Regions:
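Active-site loop segments of alpha/beta catalytic cores
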Residues: 1-153
Length: 153
């Protein structure tokens, strides 16, 4: 089946201990997540975003996607723990409000380097743990990109 897509970025908002127990999510959420992800399983790259500060990381880490993004700077696990508990790429290292919106270029460069250190530079996609604000200063976004470019040379 031709879809014309390379994959999806799938946001999971209810797999959150502040909203449901793990048993409740396994009954009422996980089956639907898995049906959606099964429909795109043959795509080249699928990523799940685990939304919220009390996400069910270990449950979602079993979804069989290529990358997992979560609020790593606001809640657990850390990137270092995440790369140990999830077999694919981890996506994070930056907090969307304090770092990307209100931070400064030098601080962001430092955080990019920390993310690389915490993961050993393997299986890492440097990103925010949630959406990047549309009003984030371009100088901050440029600093993030430049820091990544310096590392991957």
């Amino acid at each position: 089946k031709a879809t014309g897509i390379a994959g999806i970025y799938y946001a999971v908002q209810m797999a959150n201990f502040g909203l449901l127990s793990e048993a409740e999510y396994r009954a009422f959420g996980e089956p639907y997540d898995r049906r959606i992800l099964a429909a795109v399983a043959d795509c080249w790259f699928n990523m799940v975003h685990l939304h919220g500060r009390a996400g069910m990381f270990d449950l979602v880490a079993q979804y069989g996607v290529h990358a997992l993004n979560w609020h790593d700077r606001e809640s657990g696990p850390s990137l270092a723990e995440g790369v140990q508990r999830f077999g694919g790429a981890v996506s994070g290292g930056l907090e969307h409000w304090d770092d990307i919106l209100r931070g400064d270029p030098d601080g962001l460069r430092r955080l990019v380097h920390e993310a690389v250190e915490h993961t050993g530079g393997r299986r890492l996609i440097v990103s925010s743990g949630c959406v990047a604000p549309v009003n984030a200063p371009f100088s901050n976004l440029r600093a993030i990109r430049q820091a990544v470019g310096e590392i991957v040379r």
